[in-house]
Amino acid sequence: MEIGCITISHKNAKVEEIEKIWLTVKPRLEDVISKCSFSEYAYIFTCNRFEIYLVGENLKSCLQDIAEELGITGKAEIFVGESCLRHLLRVASGIESMIVGEEQILGQVRQCFNLCREGGQAGEVLERVFGKAVQVGRRVRRETAISKGSVSIGSAAVEVAERVLGTLKGKKALLVGAGEMGTLVAKAIAGKEVEAVLIANRTYEKAEELAKRIGGVAVKFDKLVDYLKVCDVVISATSAPHAVITRGDVERAMRERSQKLLIIDIALPRDVDESVAQLDGVELLTIDDLRRISEENLARRREEIAKVEGIIEEELEQLKLLLKDISARDAIAAMYSLAERFVGEEVEELYAKLNARYGVSEDVKEILNDFANSLIKKFLREPTVRLREAARKDEFHVIESIKYVFGDGNGRVSEGKDAKVEEGKPEVDVQRSKAES
């Protein structure tokens, strides 16, 4: 068993390339990864990255085949084993993000994994791995300043708008979209002394709710063109599967305005028709244009990144031990399962003989079962310890030999054995606790 991943991100690809790959892969994801021998999979998709995680055998070559099939060999990165685990911890910690330290990625990792778990694609191994990633992401933000004063994609868009226009003071801003990203934009722009923040959303009530929170004004979504005529900057961040601002919309608006119009599209898929950039008097920026903010952000946080990496390496060692224990557990279960099956048969036979000869009560059977279970635990205690040691030393041939000798371990596992095997198992919950929601 090994874990591996293939990733394409903002480091090597533009947003539209990532989007195109996702739209190509999404409807046939299982077909794409079918060339790999795997037991579990999960994926992460955001505006800046698309990653597939697999648990299986001989993953490196098949992940390379996937990259070749998708035409991303030169842009994709492939990680297997320890490097894959480290990569996921880095992603959840925010140090692989375009905006270093941004907090949104932690929720995205959790959300993507939960979808895969609910769909039955992710199992125990990935649950432990992603659970650890979420734990590490929380710890990093609690113990370091990596997210202190950090900017999200939303607030980076506001910063870019401020740079392009010189100031946002006294300007009119139109925000299209009142979801998670739109909320981040709204919070960032509310403190910039703008003259007005107009918020448009397909569900008008959501626009009203967000407007009340920041002191903005909710406007009707079907009247976008009217507001394009009067606003200085438009930031669009919906989750629509198609463009919500067309070239025709902007052309009609520009006929009735004399000043330049700045439009920033931070949605994925894109909210604004790309050809809008060709219009006179219009400047269209996208997520790719936020890279310079990312570079400045990285320079400011270099010292904190070193602290984060220290935490990641510490937690990585714990995760590796946990996964090794999981690999040993099947072999341990096989030993106990076979022993219990035979002992159970022998106890029944012995009780029948004692009952026939001495007329013993049912209480005697309970005593015999207690004795048998105690004998099993004592007899297999040392082999159990040795198997765990073998796993931690990467001596997996020992584990495979035990599984071959004792079978697949599908029999019932007793409570006594279960407590032994599961001892020290950490409680990992990928989902946000009620206290955090």
UniProtKB/Swiss-Prot annotation:
Spell out the molecular function terms from Gene Ontology.
glutamyl-tRNA reductase activity; NADP binding
SUPFAM superfamilies for the chain: Glutamyl tRNA-reductase catalytic, N-terminal domain, Glutamyl tRNA-reductase dimerization domain, NAD(P)-binding Rossmann-fold domains
User: At which residues is there a site annotated Important for activity?
Assistant: 87
Question: Which intervals of the chain form a coiled coil?
Answer: none
Protein name as annotated: Glutamyl-tRNA reductase
Q: Does the keyword Cell membrane apply?
A: no
Q: How does it assemble?
A: Homodimer.
Region entry Disordered: which residue ranges? 410-437
Amino-acid positions noted as binding substrate in the UniProt annotation, renumbered to this chain: 46-49, 97, 102-104, 108
Task: List the Pfam families.
Answer: GlutR_dimer, GlutR_N, Shikimate_DH
What pathway, per the record?
Porphyrin-containing compound metabolism; protoporphyrin-IX biosynthesis; 5-aminolevulinate from L-glutamyl-tRNA(Glu): step 1/2
Entry EC number(s):
1.2.1.70
